[in-house]
Amino acid sequence: MTHKELNELLCDMSLEEKIGQLVQVPGSCYEEGAVITGGMNNGWREETCRLAGSTLGIYGAEKLKKIQDDYLKTQPHKIPLMFMLDVIHGHKTVFPCPLAQGATFSPETSEKCAEAAAKETGASGVQVTFAPMADLVRDSRWGRVMESTGEDPYLNGKMAAAMVKGFQGEDVGEKGKIASCIKHVAAYGGAVAGLDYQNAELSEHTLREFYLPAYKAAVDAGCEMAMTSFNLLNGVPSSGNKWLMRDVLRGEWGFDGVLISDWAAVGEMVAHGYCEDNTEAAVKAIETGVDIEMCTPAYADHLETLVKEGKVSEKLIDEAVMRVLMLKNKLGLFENPYKDADEQLEREIQLCDAHRSLARQAVRESIVLLKNDSTDSDAGKKLLPINTADGMKIAFVGPYVEGQDMRSSWSVSGDEKDNVTLKTAAQEIFGGAALAEGLEEKQPGVLLRFAEGCTLLDNHTIVNLGQYDEDNWEEINASLLSEAEECAKWADVVVLALGEHRFQTGEATSRTQIELPHIQLELLRRVASVNKSIVTVLFNGRPLDLREVSKYSKAVVEAWMPGTEGGHGIMDVLTGEYNPSGKLPMSFPYNVGQLPMCYNHYSSGRPKPEGSRGDYNCRYLDAPNEPLYPFGYGLSYTSFEIGSVNLSSDSVTSGEKITASVTVKNTGKSKGSELIQLYIRDVAASRVRPIKELKGFKHIELMPGEEKKVSFDIDEELLSFFRADGSFGSEPGKFKVWIADSSLTEGDAAELTLRD
C-alpha cells in the first residue's frame, strides 16, 4: 500500500479498531477450540482478541494460516494479524546461545545464524522476532547474560547490527525475512545485584558510554522494532520514560519503527509505584510512545475512554497505529497476510543439512579453550587435542555426556530430541555401536566408555519453572559416582561433561552462587582422585566460578549452551578436527564477590601496585582484583607471537586517520586462527576514561611458521567519547594503543597524540 492509502485506511478506522492495533494478546487466545474467543478463557475479553493487532508465542504454517483466515473474517478493514515469536538463537535448528555467539567475535557467523533462523521461522508463519538482545552485561548472577553477547559495547554493537541484518536482509518484505526487535531498552542488564527485574541506577554518562551504544547500532542497522525493558531506570520505568523513548530513541537516533512493551511491562508500572492504576499506566505509556502493549489490557480497557474524555489526544493514537500499519505494510501483509507460511517449505527447511552444518560451525567457533596443560607422561605434549592413537582409552563421564537438552533458555520452538549429544558424536567419530549395557565399545585403535557420573542438579534445587526433587537422590548418586570412578580408573583420558541446567539460566534465574552444582564438583573430585588427565567440558549460559574446575582439570573447554549441533562441534574441537579460536565475551570472575566486573573499568586514585600486595590501595584482602579468565581470552592448539605495535604516525588530527599494525606469527606446529584485538586508552580527559577499551578486532589464520601483518585504522571518531559537558566528541591529548590477544595482555603500548 502507498502512504496515501495507509492514511486513508487510518482515517476510516473507528477509535476502537485503532486501539486494537495497539494491543498484543497471547497466542493462547487463538488456539484450537477458540473461535477468536479463546480469550474469554484466558482472562481476555472476546472483543479484545477479535480486534488485537498482533499475537505472540505460537507458530506452525497450517495453524497460523487458519488463525489468520478466521481473524480476517471478523475484521472491518481486513487488516491482517501480525505473528511474533521469541526466536533468540534459532527456531527448530537451535544455534549456540547469544553469549556463545559473542565468543565467536564473528558478526558474520551471527548474521548467517539469524538469516537461517528467519527462513525457518518465516516458513512457520511468524513475521517478527523479539531479537536481538543488546543488553550490556557485567554481572553473571543475572540469568539473562546468556541472551547477551557480552560486557563490551563495541562487540555488542557489531553483533546486534549483524543479527538485525541477518533477520531482515535489505527488505524485510522479501521471502525468508522477518522483522527484528532490539531489546531491552534500556539497561535491563544493569539490574542491581544481578537480580532480575530490579532497578538499574546508572548515570547518563554511564548509559551513553556503555549501555546505549549497542541499541543504537541496531537502530542504525535498520531494526523495525524496539522493546521497552521491565526495569526502572533511575527510578522511572522504561515504558514510561519519555526522555529515553522520545528524546533519545526517536529524537537523537531517528528510530521510526514500532515500540513494543515487554510482557506486562505497562501494567507493571503500577506495581513499580509509578502509576496508581492501569488507567494512568495507559496514559503514561502512550505519551511515552509505546505503540503496542504486550499482554496486559491497559490500552484495551482504558484508551478509548481516555480519548473520549480528552485525557489522551487521538493524535497520539493515530501516530502509534500508523507505525503498526507501516510495519505490516513493509512485511507485505496487506498483499499476502500469510507472508512466508508454507507447510511444505516448513518441512523441508527446518533442521535441513545446510542449517545443521551452519550450527555445527557456529559451535566450533564459539568454543573457548580456557586451559590446556601438558600430560603427565609427556611434558611437551598438551592434553588436547585428545590422543586417538591405537589402544587409547577415553572415558566420557558426566550428566552432559548423554544429556540432550543443550538448547539454553529462550529456544522456545526447539526440541531436545533433535540435539546431537556428546556420546552420539563420539560414537560417530570412532565408529561402532554401544554394547547392551552401554559401558564399553572396542574400536580400531580406540576404546570408549560412557558414564552419567551424577545427577545434573543437587537435590531440591530451584530452577525457573520449578524445583528438582528426587526421593532416592543420595542412593542414585552413590551408584553413579562409584561407576564414574571405575570408568576413570580404566581410562587414559577422562572427558568430564558438566554444567548448568538450561533453566538455571535465562529470565528469572538470578543466582547468588555461581559454582557448578555441588554433586558435580564431588564427581570432579572423585574422578581426579583416580585420574589426573581430565578434560572438563562446560555447558553453561553464564560465566561461572571455575576455581575448582580449573584446579582439578588439565584442560577446560567452555562449550556454553551449544544447541542442536553441540555434540558434533565439541567433538570436532576435542579431536583436533577444528582448532579452537573462541574468546571470552565476558570476564569469568575469580569468585562471586567480585561481581559486577568488567575489563573496561576506570583506574583508581590508588591503583594496586603491580606484583605486590600494597597497603591502602584499591584491592581485595581475600582475592585478586583480576578475573580468573579475562574478557577476550582464549587459547589455541598452536601458539602465536604478536610483535610490537607500529603506528604509521605518532599523531593524528581531525579528518585524518593513521594505521596501527603488528606482525603476527604462528610459532606452533598446527594451523590456527587468532583473534587480534585493538585496545585504546585516553590518558587524560575532561571525564576519566576506562583503563582500556576494545576498538577493533580481526581474525587471522596462519599455517605453522607463517606470519602476516594485521592493521587497524585509527581516526578522531574512534577516539571520541561523551565529554564532561555531555557532548560527544574528541579532546586533544595522548592515547595508548595495544594490539593483543586478550584484554589482560600487558606489554609496551604505542603512544599516539590527537592534535587540534
Residue positions per predicted region:
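Glycoside hydrolase catalytic-domain context in secreted enzymes
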Residues: 1-723, 729-745, 752-756
